[in-house]
């Protein structure tokens, strides 16, 4: 009775989603649970009983950072592949040796990476970039998989520009392409990095187009919003629906 009294307080509220703990599935608890599902239209899911892995990818300026901020707000563990990669470059001696052999001189005498020099080695040079990526994937993918395995049940999000190329998409329940019109991406990159329109466009054209991500990912989140706040509201609705869908799918497999 207390559960239904509490639910009635939301009758005239704009709230779109309500979560309530379902009673024990025996005796009176079974009756209340059935009423929640049938009369009140609730869907039964086991909250955080399993791990849900989402992979986010897309080009620079599309809005991945804003989307990830929403996922963090929803309680997700976010694995930033770029951050893990740079941490490994600083700490993993085997990875450093492999990088030094392939790209002599990109590491300074103190062992730190000269990112500008490495960038010059691979920017707009397909063969060099492929060589670098092969090294990165060999070390990075097992580390991301290790961190995923160590994470508690719930939602995990992988943030990776090369999610598809590295094969990490195979570890995901859903892959999400974050896309956005080129003119908006240019504006965001110019404001974020304090660079000219010419250089912003160069960065975009050096990466794969939205059509590539759209065609290979299981779903798309388009960022055509004028402000980050507007996009985050859209992203929150999108991810809530997506997470609920994956949870229900996993639950149905058990039945």
List where the protein language model places each region.
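Walker A/P-loop
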Residues: 65
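ATP-dependent small-molecule kinase phosphotransfer cores
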Residues: 83-153
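ATP-dependent NMP and nucleoside kinases share a basic, alpha-helical "lid"
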Residues: 142-150, 155-192
